[in-house]
Amino acid sequence: MASAKSGERGSSSFAMACSLLSRYVRQNGAAAGELGLGIRGEADANKGKETMELFPQNSGFGSEAAAVKETPDAREQEKRQLTIFYGGKVLVFDDFPAEKAKDLMQMASKSSSTAQNCVLLPSSATATVADNTKVSAVPAPASALPVAQANAPKPVRPNAADLPQARKASLHRFLEKRKDRLQAKAPYQGSPSDASPVKKELQESQPWLGLGPQVAAPDLSLRQESSQ
């Protein structure tokens, strides 16, 4: 019985201690945070919750203040110096915005396209302009022209009397070449007078080859005498 009573007293004292501690923490939340108990007071609980942006609009790791500071520098960089070469003159403009420069370039391109689509000149005028440009494009020194004309070879004009002689000479050469070709094709052919003695010598050296045509006619007179 004594042990049961002592247990009830201990549990009641522990419950009282916990209730006192909770009251103290609620009243003094900052002090409890310093103690490191991990319990926040009523003031911390009433603070608004901060949300984390998973898809930020400004890329990069810099803060918004840094981004705001960079914008005027970018605007200053857009304004630069512009130089224009027109009509043999140089025009310089300081702090010229980039947007106006783009507009100016578009206007210049449009004007160049309209100039190309202008009315064409007549053929005679274009021919004269082309001739003038060709002459002016390659200027020749005045001192070199007479020397070049003097040293230029004069064309040879053939005389009418020399033409028949040249034709005869060419014909004679053609006939000589043709004769040489014929001799080269048949080198062993000769005249018929040269071939006749050769045939006679062959017939005399080989009489047996010509027995048929060279057989003499029989002498009938001798046979008649013997028969008598």
UniProtKB/Swiss-Prot annotation:
The keyword Ubl conjugation applies. The gene is TIFY10A. It is found in: Nucleus. Interacts with COI1A and COI1B in a coronatine-dependent manner. Coronatine is an analog of jasmonoyl isoleucine (JA-Ile). Induction: By jasmonate, wounding, and cold, drought and salt stresses. Down-regulated by abscisic acid (ABA). It comes from the Eukaryota. The keyword Transferase does not apply. GO terms for cellular component: nucleus. The lineage of its organism: Eukaryota, Viridiplantae, Streptophyta, Embryophyta, Tracheophyta. A motif (Jas) lies at residues 164-189. This is Protein TIFY 10a. Keywords: Jasmonic acid signaling pathway, Nucleus, Transcription, Transcription regulation, Ubl conjugation. Belongs to the TIFY/JAZ family. Residues 75-110 form the Tify domain. A motif (Nuclear localization signal) lies at residues 166-173. Residues 175-228 are annotated as: Disordered. Its main location: nucleus.
